[in-house]
């Protein structure tokens, strides 16, 4: 049986799991997926790790198409995901409906969990939000970075702090036990990321890989 190797941003994990049983049965293959920060997944492909399909942010997939690592004609948007605020399950939900309210909530938090800006789309953006809200120095000692969104949310769930908050892609929040989604980031601080799939140029199972991209597209929409 063919095994399809997938390297994907963590935000697409739930989408892949939704289609996995029916796709594997229908196509007669298995999906071997790794999910983490989009930058880390790109780096693994560039380092030579075998992969048949990539799911990353649109900008990273476009760059891989330009560099010859994915097939340009296979590039397909599969989902859009908002970056959102989270708290531990059972904690009060802070008001984050405006930029000023978000600033107040972050200033009151004793821990702020989000993915590493060096690798993750949500992390890059949220670090910029903190700077935009002029909180960079004030909260520097409270920032807790995870290798990816899922790791950051698990750390938030396990936190023993009094008022921790977190931020990552909404799909990663929903997929993590022990945390709840408060709301997407407010206007002026918001981010909606387009996740895009593509077949790699080194794929040894191009037909099956293309079928996976199609299945993801149908389910994502």
Model-derived regions, located:
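Exported/periplasmic ABC-transporter solute-binding proteins
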Residues: 1-34, 39, 43, 47, ...
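Phosphopantetheine-dependent thiolation modules in NRPS/PKS and related acyl-activating systems
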Residues: 52-53
């Amino acid at each position: 049986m063919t095994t399809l190797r997938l390297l994907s941003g963590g935000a697409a994990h739930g989408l892949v799991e939704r289609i996995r049983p029916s796709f594997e049965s229908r196509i007669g293959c298995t999906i071997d997926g790794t999910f983490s920060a989009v930058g880390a997944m790109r780096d693994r492909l560039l380092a030579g790790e075998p992969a048949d399909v990539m799911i990353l942010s649109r900008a990273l997939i476009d760059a891989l198409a330009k560099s010859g690592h994915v097939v340009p004609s296979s590039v397909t948007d599969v989902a859009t995901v908002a970056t959102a605020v989270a708290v531990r399950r059972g904690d009060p939900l802070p008001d984050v409906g405006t930029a000023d309210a978000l600033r107040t909530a972050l200033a009151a938090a004793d821990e702020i969990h989000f993915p590493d800006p060096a690798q993750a789309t949500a992390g890059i953006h949220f670090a910029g939000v903190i700077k935009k809200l002029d909180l960079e120095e004030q909260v520097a000692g409270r920032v807790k970075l995870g290798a990816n969104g899922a790791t950051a949310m698990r750390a938030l769930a396990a936190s023993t702090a009094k008022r921790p908050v977190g931020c990552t892609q909404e799909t990663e929040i929903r997929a993590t036990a022990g945390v709840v989604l408060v709301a997407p980031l407010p206007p002026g601080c918001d981010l909606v990321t387009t996740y895009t799939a593509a077949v790699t140029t080194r794929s040894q199972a191009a037909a099956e890989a293309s079928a996976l991209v199609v299945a993801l597209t149908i389910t994502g929409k």
